[in-house]
Amino acid sequence: KLNLKIARLTESHNENNTPADEINADIQSEVIEKLRLNKELFVSQPIYNRLKQLNLKRDSDSVDRTAAKEVLDGVIGQFADVCSNLRQLYVGMTYDDVLYCAAIYVGFSKELASVAFGSSEDALRRRKSRIKQKLPSTIFDAIFGTKV
């Protein structure tokens, strides 16, 4: 249902050249709900315990790269659909952008994200800043937990 709605809105957005904030205002809550449900499912899987263990390491050099990639693969498996939705809705978002959003949403620490994405923490800070420009504030805040 959400995918059909997104496809319709994306079509009308492309035809009318309406700003993303406007065209997507009515489905932002549905996207956020889809994120929440996926997180609920992810948390119930064994891979989530692995994520929690890896998050305890506060030094990115001590994080096992293979384990970090395995957890990231688990995130990809769980959030593929919602990541695809975000890319359809917000055309400026890259695959890595939406994957980073999903990883942060499920609880990746800065250090773990740095290892999993093979990027410095500084590069990830810049990515987050670029993502903030691309997403409506309600979705950005829901993903990054900037508003309670």
Report residues per predicted region:
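Cytosolic nucleotide-binding catalytic cores of signal-transduction proteins
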Residues: 56-148
